[in-house]
A protein has these predicted regions:
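Catalytic cores of nucleotide-sugar-dependent glycosyltransferases that transfer UDP/GDP/TDP-activated
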Residues: 1-158
């Protein structure tokens, strides 16, 4: 089963509360079950970008519209690659990479709407058609809406 997991935090990369712990344990546990292939998507926050222990490689980039703004979307993959669990980061300095905070900015709604739409665009770019789209907390809540509105024909089984 192909499972795309979308969250705003996951230990050890970034953790502000219990969600970070869950998102460290759950993808790892699911990846150990026979037949599962997991992709975890996280924002590429400044603290992740600046952590020398986290090594990534860019696997793609493109532009994406969000309302009135045309925005860069970078897709980075955690190195080294693992067979059944891939960790991807959505890179955009305006929304994530230049800020020292994870939450609490005046434009969090816009930031995470961008993140949700960028995850769907990244899944399409990577041609990873999930059987399950597992979205965690409000920051990822718009991802299924973008799936239905923009990517249903590409991925109707999800």
């Amino acid at each position: 089963m192909r499972i795309a997991m979308v969250a705003s935090e996951a230990a050890p990369f970034v953790k502000t509360g219990g969600l970070g712990d869950v998102m460290q344990a759950l993808p790892n546990a699911l990846s150990k079950l026979k037949g599962n292939e997991i992709c975890l998507f996280l924002p590429y926050y400044k603290r992740i970008k600046e952590d020398p222990a986290i090594e990534t490689e860019q696997v793609g980039s493109f532009s994406m519209e969000l309302a009135w703004r045309e925005s860069y979307v970078g897709i980075l993959r955690l190195k080294p690659r693992r067979k059944k669990l891939q960790v991807y980061f959505i890179d955009n300095d305006y929304y994530f990479g230049a800020r020292s905070t994870v939450y609490g900015d005046f434009d969090d709604g816009e930031r995470f709407a961008y993140f949700s739409k960028a995850v769907m665009a990244a899944l399409y770019f990577l041609d990873f058609k999930p059987d399950i789209l597992h979205c965690h907390d409000w920051q990822a809540a718009m991802t299924p809406a973008y799936l239905r509105a923009l990517y249903h024909d590409w991925c109707p089984q999800t």
